[in-house]
Amino acid sequence: MSALHPGNEILPPRERGALTLYLVTTLALLLVLMVFGLLMRMAQGTWLHVPPTLFYQLMTAHGAGMVGTVALGGSAVMWYFLRKYVSLSLPIFLTNYILFMLGAVLLLAATFLGHYAGGWTFLYPLPVKSMGIWSVGAAALF
């Protein structure tokens, strides 16, 4: 142990693995979502042709994904610091991860398979009045 790594801050292997899973996933999602943002900027600059429906799907996934990904990474950081003061459950931490990933898959399925493109804010009337662009099921999944 050293002053930089006191004994009470070293994670047991299973907890270190869970925290690494969260952080690697957060970084991977941020990279994918940055690519979505870059594609939108390239389309706006006429460097790349992106159909309007795909543009709004990218915008929806980018916005909702950035907010959610920051929440995922933030929960990992909070768990790391809070565990020194409160007894936290590793199974609950992993359950949170699984539920988050399930939500991310549903969001992506609604956006790219169901063609949902109502924007990340999900403001009325877009989710309800899609003008035939996406289904009610896609809006419900989102």
Please place each PLM-identified region on the residue numbering.
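Transmembrane helix-loop junctions at the membrane interface of multipass transporters and ion channels
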Residues: 118-124
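Extramembrane terminal tails and long inter-domain/linker segments of multi-pass membrane proteins
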Residues: 1-17
